[in-house]
């Protein structure tokens, strides 16, 4: 056995499972960071082991998907008496399960899963169940994990955060940080062909507030209701990524063609792909989203509903990194490169009335609102930075469904009233802020009944069905009010469902602070 494999064998699944339980059992951020850092020191300097531990404690598999649904986890064999499973052995088992394909794949996958659970203790089984079921919520969010990596490596947290921002892969950054090489994180730079986490926006109550928060002047842009895309070009090679950093190049040939027409050799751009009607008004979001399906006949889809691409930011252009440049400089580079037909409408103003007219015109054109950007702000990749504020005609929030109630009357037999949670950035948990059954079409009721049956935890026999907190839903609200009914002390006013956001994960849901900001 090589020294590296011997190192891998020294950390057991039990060690990770108990650390996960410890982290989930404390509300203290400092205690969470210290506990994770302690485990990471034990795993260092083995890069593979560090990456596995960081992935698991972040609630993810290195393999991402291995074909194991919740139904396969409902029954499990008796637990082992003593812990013997190593982290590397379990990771290898996940890889083996994920590689199963062809005739009899389901039975073979089930047998491998059963063997894995049979070798696990009760503590380990509980951890595996939550990890594979997507329910591992012990509060180890990216910020906490980055702090833990920094503490374990003895380096500034800002260095880890920036490397993760540029590398788009915290496990890889953690492995480098704990390798013992002082300059290991220097390799994580902005690089064409490697996606970075997109910048996200906070919410403003109106254009006047947005101008005030940006210091008296703001750049307003039309907010398109399409699909976020990050475009990379290196010579004749174009790659297109979604907001979750999935490669969708093959599904969006129009974006590739439009990018190749630009007079540039090296480019990283942020933009929106959107389906338009013949009069250039936007189609419903679902029409755009249908172009991102995995089992898509691309040629037929392009013929039936072509997409247009609009670029609203540039991060790199022909050897020049613009990530840290102010918004005005990035937009100047954009205007010099991208033709007007592929830019979003824009207005720089300090006048709330002018901004209000711009918002009204944008809404009249069929778009969902405006973005207000600070002229001097950098591009804060991977962060919901204060440099971008979204303004919509009604307040909207992206929340997570925590539970759902069976309907009555015309909705009997349908899962109807959804319980809504906002993310607590301090703990990683979700705080319930209200319920709603409004805004749901018959088709939506059918869809969510199937979806939440799949996500159900503990069966669907009761009136209230608890679900794994994975489904993000966009709701419109008239505001919030104080309430002792919910743990956050606030309740949504007149919440109604706008759409389900399959393009967003629960970590991208709005925070309880965003809800409080509407009070």
Curated annotation (Swiss-Prot):
Q: Which HAMAP family match?
A: DNA_ligase (MF_00407)
In the UniProt record, the gene name given for this protein reads: lig
Checking InterPro entries in the record gives: ATP-dep_DNA_ligase (IPR050191), DNA_ligae_ATP-dep_bac/arc (IPR022865), DNA_ligase_ATP-dep (IPR000977), DNA_ligase_ATP-dep_C (IPR012309), DNA_ligase_ATP-dep_cent (IPR012310), DNA_ligase_ATP-dep_CS (IPR016059), DNA_ligase_ATP-dep_N (IPR012308), DNA_ligase_N_sf (IPR036599)
Pfam families from the xrefs?
DNA_ligase_A_C, DNA_ligase_A_M, DNA_ligase_A_N
UniProt cross-references to Gene3D superfamilies, sorted A to Z: DNA ligase, ATP-dependent, N-terminal domain, DNA ligase/mRNA capping enzyme, Nucleic acid-binding proteins
Recorded catalytic reaction(s): these are:
ATP + (deoxyribonucleotide)n-3'-hydroxyl + 5'-phospho-(deoxyribonucleotide)m = (deoxyribonucleotide)n+m + AMP + diphosphate
Which GO molecular function annotations are given, in alphabetical order? ATP binding; DNA binding; DNA ligase (ATP) activity; metal ion binding
Q: What Enzyme Commission number does this protein have?
A: 6.5.1.1
User: What is the protein's given name?
Assistant: Probable DNA ligase
Q: Which keywords, in A-to-Z order, does the entry hold?
A: ATP-binding, Cell cycle, Cell division, DNA damage, DNA recombination, DNA repair, DNA replication, Ligase, Magnesium, Metal-binding, Nucleotide-binding
Q: Which PANTHER family match?
A: DNA LIGASE 1/3 FAMILY MEMBER (PTHR45674), DNA LIGASE-RELATED (PTHR45674:SF13)
Catalytic-site annotation from UniProt: 223 (n6-amp-lysine intermediate)
């Amino acid at each position: 056995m090589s020294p590296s494999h011997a190192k891998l064998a020294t950390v057991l699944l039990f060690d990770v499972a108990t650390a996960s339980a410890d982290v989930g059992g404390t509300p203290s951020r400092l205690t969470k960071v210290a506990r994770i850092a302690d485990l990471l020191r034990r795993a260092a300097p083995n890069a593979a082991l560090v990456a596995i531990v960081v992935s698991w404690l972040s609630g993810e598999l290195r393999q991402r998907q291995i074909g194991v649904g919740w139904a396969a986890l409902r029954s499990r064999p008796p637990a082992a008496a003593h812990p013997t499973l190593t982290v590397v052995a379990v990771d290898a088992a996940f890889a083996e399960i994920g590689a199963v394909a062809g005739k009899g794949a389901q039975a073979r996958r089930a047998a491998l899963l059963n063997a894995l659970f049979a070798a696990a203790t009760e503590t380990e089984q509980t951890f595996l169940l939550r990890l594979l079921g997507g329910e591992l919520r012990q509060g180890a969010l990216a910020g906490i994990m980055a702090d833990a990596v920094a503490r374990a490596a003895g380096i500034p947290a800002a260095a880890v955060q920036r490397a993760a921002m540029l590398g788009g892969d915290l496990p890889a950054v953690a492995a480098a940080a704990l390798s013992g090489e002082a300059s290991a994180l220097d390799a994580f730079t902005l690089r064409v062909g490697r996606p970075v986490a997109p910048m996200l926006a906070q919410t403003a109550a109106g254009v006047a507030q947005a101008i005030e928060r940006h210091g008296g002047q703001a750049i307003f842009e039309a907010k398109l209701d399409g699909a976020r895309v990050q475009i990379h070009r290196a010579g004749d090679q174009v790659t297109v990524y979604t907001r979750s950093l999935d490669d969708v190049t093959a599904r969006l040939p129009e974006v590739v063609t439009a990018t190749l027409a630009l007079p540039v050799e090296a480019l990283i751009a942020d933009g929106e792909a959107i389906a338009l009607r013949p009069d250039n008004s936007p189609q419903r979001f679902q029409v755009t989203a249908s172009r991102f399906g995995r089992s898509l006949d691309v040629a037929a889809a392009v013929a039936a509903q072509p997409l247009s691409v609009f670029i609203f930011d540039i991060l790199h252009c022909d050897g020049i990194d613009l990530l840290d440049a102010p918004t005005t400089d990035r937009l100047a580079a954009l205007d010099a490169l991208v033709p007007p037909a592929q830019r979003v409408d824009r207005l720089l103003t300090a006048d709330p009335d002018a901004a209000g007219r711009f918002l009204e015109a944008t809404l009249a054109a069929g778009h969902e609102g405006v973005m207000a950007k600070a002229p001097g702000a950098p591009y804060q990749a991977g962060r919901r930075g204060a440099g971008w504020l979204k303004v919509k005609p009604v307040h909207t929030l992206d929340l997570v469904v925590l539970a759902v109630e069976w309907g009555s009357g015309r909705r009997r037999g349908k899962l109807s009233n959804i319980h809504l949670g906002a993310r607590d950035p301090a703990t990683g948990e979700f705080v319930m802020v209200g319920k709603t059954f409004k805004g749901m079409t018959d088709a939506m009721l059918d869809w969510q009944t199937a979806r939440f049956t799949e996500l159900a935890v503990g069966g669907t026999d009761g009136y209230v069905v608890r679900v794994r907190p994975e489904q993000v839903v966009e709701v419109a609200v008239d505001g919030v009010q104080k309430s002792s009914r919910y743990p956050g002390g606030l309740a949504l006013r007149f919440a109604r469902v706008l759409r389900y956001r399959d393009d967003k994960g629960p970590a991208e849901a709005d925070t309880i602070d965003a809800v409080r900001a509407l009070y």
